[in-house]
Structures are given as structure tokens and as C-alpha cells.
């Protein structure tokens, strides 16, 4: 609920708590007749990924950003026949992301509302506790005083 509320405050048109509503019902309510073009799996929830795969448009793209359990089942038949593109985070693509983000920030993108917690790097455990709690947006670890 915390992150859904944060998304609403940041301008999300619709947020969905899958424990309370079915994605297909929400799609119908907002007038969607096809699936999603882009999906971003950030929760690390296997059932959420499965639901996303089943509700993507042909040729849709899914970014896998959450850490899923090792035994997560992926319906490869749906992925193959719907031409879905699943992409994780790896190597040089991360650097490309940094360059794009830098450009977006320089052009005026305000990321401040997404950053909900800041900790000195020496308090990294508190940062991880905030992330794990589900009651945070982005957590920033400040390395400024690492050698003090």
C-alpha cells in the first residue's frame, strides 16, 4: 500500500493491489482492449510476474527489476507465442541506463519525490531495513563520509 500511494502521489493514473483486485478487471475498467505494451516487474513476486506475462500485448516488453525466487516458473509458451521480450539488468546496459538517466535529470526531471530515505553508508543496514519493510520508495546511501 505504501508504494501504491507513493505512485499515486507521483501521478500514476491507476495503481493495482493484486491482493484486492484482478488485473483483468482493472484493465476492463479503464477501457483496455489489448494487453500492456511495457511491464516493469519490481516486486520480486512470482505470481505478479505470471499475471504480467498473461496480460501483455503481443510483442510486449517486460523489464525484470525485482529479484524473483530461484524456482520461479515462467510460462515460456506464452512468452514465445506472444513474442514477449523479457529483459533483466546486466553489464553494459546498466551504463546506458546511467547515461539516459543523467540526460533526463539534466533536462529537468525531478526525482526527489521518489527518494524517501537517505542514510550514511555506515548505516547501510538501516537502509536495507527500510527497503525490506515495503514502506519506502528509493533509498539512497551517502558515501560522502566513508573515510571519516
Protein language model features and the residues they cover:
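Short, charged/polar "capping" segments at the starts of alpha-helices
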Residues: 1-5, 73, 148
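Adenosine-nucleotide cofactor-binding segment
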Residues: 1-51
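Glycine/Thr-rich phosphate-binding loops of Rossmann-like dinucleotide-binding domains
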Residues: 49-50, 71-73
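C-terminal hydrophobic helical "lid"/dimerization subdomain
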Residues: 50-54, 95-148
